[in-house]
Amino acid sequence: METGLDFSVVWTNITYFMIGRYPSGPIGGVLLTLYLAVISLIFSFFGGLILGLMCVAKSRYIRYPTLAVVNAVRGIPLLMVIFWMYFLLPFVMGKIVPESWTVITALSLFTSAYMSQIVQAGIEGIPRGQTEAALSTGLRPWHAMVFVVLPQAIRNMIPSFVNQFVSMIKDTSLAFIVGVSELTHVATQVNNRTMIYPAEIFLFIAVIYFIICFAFTSLSRWLEQRLAWRKAI
């Protein structure tokens, strides 16, 4: 009886794991996972930034409704948000929405809610004297926030941003539930076709997820060190 792991199924399907059916068909696998992650990262960064600024707004008519929405979204499982976007977006827009964009919308909304709390904490961590000094030079409150407080706060937010972004990269695996052919979905398809190599297949995709997350973490650490070096100068 043969023992040990046999990764031949991985090497046989390596192209499918990496890019799906592209170029003869739609992209999939690792390429689609990166696409979902990068687009969602961009949207959630700016979404979280806007929501975070609204959470610290002086007007209670802006601050309280924003906090209510953010806390509501944070209290809902991501899987439910994906299902809601999958069924609601086509109804609201009146046309068919690609499954990948329903997932991007769900990931962006969900992560933006968590990002907003990071932004809020980062802004509130800056000494109030910074704002007062900026206002004393004649800057308006909004300009003081954008040009003085926020740049300092973002440097302090980077580690928390990275943790949230890495979590979101792993959360792209939930896209398989609505039929998006990202890495987990592709691995499930290959496993269902072969039926005898589940350990090898899912060990392989675990390594791929680790490499993606490690690469992003290393890049962010380099960026953090770069910003710290420039600040020291």
Which residues does each predicted region cover?
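Transmembrane alpha-helices and adjacent helix-loop boundaries
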Residues: M1-I233
